């Protein structure tokens, strides 16, 4: 196993333990090693990981900068899946910053890319995030429609998502009956 990969795995373990500063250090070191080895995709993954850590730490600007850079690299290299994931991460960061319009734009970009590559699960999850943002923005009907459409796309819904599906189906039936 390469030194970069070892550092990456150590970073993931530390992240899962909630040791964010230590995880960020390992990811930064892995980033340097991957860059030296000319492994741009892996280096960009480390940037994306750093962005996720900075979001957890509420260091919004650093989070956005890291994920933006990762997104640019993924786009340049033609990795649409990772680019879409980075767009989705940016949506979450912008939403946390209270920049709802930028969050919605980022999620829409992610949804488009996920649709392009046929990843319905991630497309659905992202549509649900967009739906929540639209709902909070006062665009209730549009938000509910996006959330419901996203919920239907998720192949392996959580228990809560399954319950929500049932409730939305009941609501639609009652509405169609005039209740």
Regions found by a protein language model. Name each.
Residues 5-18, 25, 32, 41-56, ...:
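Conserved alpha-helical positions within TPR/SEL1-like repeat arrays
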Residues 107, 128, 132-158:
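TPR/TPR-like (Sel1-like) alpha-helical repeat modules
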Residues 144-147, 151-179:
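Terminal, low-structured helical/coil segments at or just beyond the last alpha-helical repeat
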């Amino acid at each position: 196993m390469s030194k970069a990969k070892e550092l990456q795995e150590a970073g993931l373990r530390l992240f899962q333990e909630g040791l964010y500063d230590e995880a960020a250090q390992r990811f930064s070191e892995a980033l340097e090693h991957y860059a030296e080895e000319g492994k741009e995709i892996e280096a960009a993954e480390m940037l994306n990981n750093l962005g996720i850590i900075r979001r957890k730490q509420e260091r919004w600007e650093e989070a956005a900068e890291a994920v933006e850079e990762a997104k640019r690299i993924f786009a340049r290299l033609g990795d649409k899946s990772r680019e879409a994931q980075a767009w989705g991460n940016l949506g979450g960061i912008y939403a946390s910053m209270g920049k709802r319009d930028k969050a919605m734009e980022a999620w829409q970009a992610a949804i488009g890319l996920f649709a392009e590559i046929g990843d319905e699960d991630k497309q659905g999850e992202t549509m649900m995030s967009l739906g929540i943002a639209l709902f909070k923005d006062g665009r209730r009907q549009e938000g509910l429609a996006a959330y419901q459409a996203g919920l239907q796309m998720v192949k392996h819904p959580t228990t809560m998502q399954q319950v929500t599906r049932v409730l939305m189906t009941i609501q639609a039936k009652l509405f169609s009956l005039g209740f």
